[in-house]
Amino acid sequence: GEAFLMLHRNKKPNDVHEGKWIGVGGKLERGETPQECAAREIFEETGLRAKPVLKGIITFPEFTPDLDWYTYVFKVTDFEGELIECNEGTLEWVPYDQVLSKPTWEGDHTFVEWLLEDKPFFSAMFRYDGDRLLESQVDFYE
């Protein structure tokens, strides 16, 4: 069946995502496009060569005390290679019907559902206070 490759963040010290199951990702490097960043991060963390497809954008106002986070959400169905050991956590193929039962950010459950349902391109906002989701909004674009 179909599955998401998820990362159980259980290896990095002082990790804002510690203990949570999240998608693979990372920060843009200078001069890099979001697409290039996604492909690079996927390769660095998983060993897979992937062709990421942009599905949405999420804003996280004041996700850390001094920073807003702007996140590009990609979905990958076209990839090749063998999984490697990840230094940020444990990689696991999680069947679609089990993804929403994994401990993660509350907002992640929401946008993972959008990916599972193949919703149109989205622009969303999730505002947190620590681990608690305070507010969210989304626009879908046909």
Residue spans for each PLM region:
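A structural microfeature
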Residues: 56-59
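Charged phosphate-binding loop/patch that engages nucleotide di/tri-phosphates or the phosphate backbone
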Residues: 117-142
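A short acidic, glycine-rich active-site loop
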Residues: 25
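Unchanged
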Residues: 28-51, 61-115, 136-142
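N-terminal strand-loop-strand
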Residues: 1-22, 49-50, 54
